[in-house]
C-alpha cells in the first residue's frame, strides 16, 4: 500500500465520520471536540 493510498483511505474515513456526525445531533457535539 502506498502513502497516497493511505492518505486517500484516511480522507474517506474522515468524510464518513463527518457524515455520521452531521446526521446525528447528539454525536455531532462529540465529534467537534
Swiss-Prot record:
Record's function text: This heterodimer may have anti-inflammatory properties, since the myrmexin complex (composed of 6 SS-LS heterodimers) inhibits carrageenin-induced edema in a dose-dependent manner (after subcutaneous injection into rats).
Regions crossing the membrane: none
GO annotation, cellular component aspect: extracellular region
Organism taxonomic ancestry: Eukaryota, Metazoa, Ecdysozoa, Arthropoda, Hexapoda
Family: Belongs to the myrmexin family.
Other facts noted in the record for this chain: There are 6 heterodimeric myrmexins which consist of a small subunit (SS1 or SS2 or SS3) disulfide-linked to a larger, quite structurally unrelated subunit (LS1 or LS2). MALDI experiments give a mass of 7069 Da for U1-PSDTX-Pt1a heterodimer (SS1+LS2).
Subunit structure: Heterodimer composed of subunit LS2 and subunit SS1, heterodimer composed of subunit LS2 and SS2, and heterodimer composed of subunit LS2 and SS3; disulfide-linked.
Compartment annotation: Secreted
Taxonomic source organism: Pseudomyrmex triplarinus
Keywords assigned: Disulfide bond, Secreted
Protein name, as recorded: U1-pseudomyrmecitoxin-Pt1 subunit LS2
Main subcellular localisation: secreted
Tissue/organ expression: Expressed by the venom gland.
